[in-house]
UniProtKB/Swiss-Prot annotation:
It comes from Eremothecium gossypii (strain ATCC 10895 / CBS 109.51 / FGSC 9923 / NRRL Y-1056) (Yeast). Coiled coil: none annotated. Mg(2+) binds at E73. This is Tubulin alpha chain. Pfam families: Tubulin, Tubulin_C. Dimer of alpha and beta chains. A typical microtubule is a hollow water-filled tube with an outer diameter of 25 nm and an inner diameter of 15 nM. Alpha-beta heterodimers associate head-to-tail to form protofilaments running lengthwise along the microtubule wall with the beta-tubulin subunit facing the microtubule plus end conferring a structural polarity. Microtubules usually have 13 protofilaments but different protofilament numbers can be found in some organisms and specialized cells. The lineage of its organism: Eukaryota, Fungi, Dikarya, Ascomycota, Saccharomycotina. The gene is TUB1. It catalyses: GTP + H2O = GDP + phosphate + H(+). It is an enzyme of class 3 (hydrolase). Keywords: Cytoplasm, Cytoskeleton, GTP-binding, Hydrolase, Magnesium, Metal-binding, Microtubule, Nucleotide-binding.
Length: 448
């Protein structure tokens, strides 16, 4: 067994993305909202090994997610406790406090968040005791909120201490350039990135603005809600985890992600693209061949973060196909991409394409605007272009910190001001790392 524990949900964003993900997982595996199998099924879809990665089967035949929900204020988790999927989760896996982090990293990390830490770790330990061979952890949280950034990074630190060698993958909601929910997002993002840089093995960033635009352009939703965004994010998370949950010709496990995508420990922020993203009205007019969806992944309009990969260089690329896909078509599509001059690979990593194929086609939730398609692809690519995202947030951090704006709220919660400069220097070093990695190595060789 290769189980994965989802720490779905640290904070509001994490909880709501978690809801969308578990609704989708349940549909994909044929599990009803009450945790029992759909009529006509004798066992969940995905085979014995597959579904047990994410679900634990009880003696009564109920399937319980290996997941923990965490938030410092009760509202969002109360929605889970009273919602359609309330019977799916173990009540003790829904952990909420009484006061929120007020968009303040220091409250989530040092004061309010720390009070809940023992309860959360205790619950995670109980879930891990039920696992035969724990593979790792999957986090969903936002970088800009107080709970997501503060408590999220505190949990990652603790899990590194308690479960040293286990993989820790994050899906992190990055503050969008235009769609901002709080003024202090740049502070929270820089502080949490600094704290988690050495603890997370691989971080898939998701940018709300990029997903807003996908919903508007591809799904024809004039005013996308957070539910629309979360349904789309859930499809991506499902694609990344599909090869852990279903059989395929080329399966990828958690450790393989970092082995294939992370050339240096600090440079662990792959860019995620997904195709096809089609509304129900357009679905029948598209052929969605393997070649078309593969090419679409290299278009900026299908990326989860606003940046331009055409100006960056690719260090490593992972293509995860789902559904009606044969290896020969994939090889042809990849060869065509490599022949194009638009995709630049770094010169020290010439081949750089890892491929996974899972035969289970993508599923669309009933209330989603996404259409059901026979095949889809999710591309994870480690590209130097994602450094743009760090530059943007660092610049906003500098503008505020030059005036020491809002700093007193953080210091008042027991944080030292020196942490701001330390975190900012670490991110400046991260920007430099990306520049160095993208530089051609021929110049270095001439020195010898």
């Amino acid at each position: 067994m290769r189980e994965v524990i989802s720490v779905n949900a640290v904070g509001q964003a994490g909880c709501q993305i978690g809801n969308a993900c578990w609704e989708l997982y349940s549909l994909e595996h044929g599990i009803r909202p009450d945790g029992y199998l759909q009529e006509g099924l004798t066992k969940p879809k995905g085979g014995e090994e597959g579904f047990s990665t994410f679900f634990n089967e009880t003696g009564s035949g109920k399937f319980v997610p290996r997941a923990v929900y965490v938030d410092l204020e009760p509202n969002v988790i109360d929605e889970v406790r009273t919602g359609a999927y309330r019977e799916l989760f173990h009540p003790e896996q829904l952990i909420s406090g009484k006061e929120d982090a007020a968009n303040n990293y220091a409250r989530g990390h040092y004061t309010v968040g720390r009070e809940l830490l023992d309860d959360i770790l205790d619950r995670i330990r109980k879930i891990s005791d039920q696992c035969d061979g724990l593979q790792g952890f999957l986090f969903t949280h936002s970088l800009g909120g107080g709970t997501g950034s503060g408590l999220g990074s505190l949990l990652l630190e603790q899990l590194s201490i308690d479960y040293g060698k286990k993989s820790k993958l994050e899906f992190a909601v990055y503050p969008a350039p235009q769609v901002s929910t709080s003024v202090v997002e740049p502070y929270n993002t820089v502080l949490t990135t600094h704290t988690t840089l050495e603890h997370a093995d691989c971080t898939f960033m998701v940018d709300n603005e990029a997903i807003y635009e996908m919903c508007k352009k591809n799904l024809d939703i004039s005013r996308p809600s957070f539910a629309n965004l979360n349904n789309l994010i859930a499809q991506v998370v499902s694609s990344v985890t599909a090869s852990l949950r279903f059989d395929g010709s080329l399966n990828v496990d958690l450790n393989e992600f970092q082995t294939n995508l992370v050339p240096y420990p600090r440079i662990h922020f792959p860019l995620v693209s997904y195709a096809p993203i089609l509304s129900k009205s357009k679905a029948h007019h598209e052929s969605n061949s393997v070649g078309e969806i593969t090419n679409a992944c290299f278009e900026p309009g299908n990326q989860m973060v606003k940046c331009d990969p055409r100006v960056g260089k690719y260090m490593a690329t992972c293509l995860l196909y789902r559904g009606d896909v044969v290896t020969r078509d994939v090889q042809t599509a990849v060869a065509q991409v490599k022949n194009k001059k638009t995709v630049q690979l770094v010169d020290w990593c010439p081949t750089g394409f890892k491929i996974g194929i899972c035969y289970e086609p993508p599923t669309a939730t009933p209330n989603s605007q996404l259409s059901s398609v026979s095949r889809a692809v999710c591309m994870l690519s480690n590209t130097t272009a994602i450094a743009d995202a760090w530059k943007r947030i660092d610049r906003k951090f500098d503008l505020m910190y030059a005036k020491r704006a809002f700093v007193h709220w953080y210091v008042g919660e027991g944080m030292e001001e020196g942490e701001f400069t330390e975190a900012r220097e670490d991110l400046a070093a991260l920007e430099r790392d990306y520049i160095e990695v993208g530089a051609d190595s021929y110049a270095d060789e001439e020195e010898f």
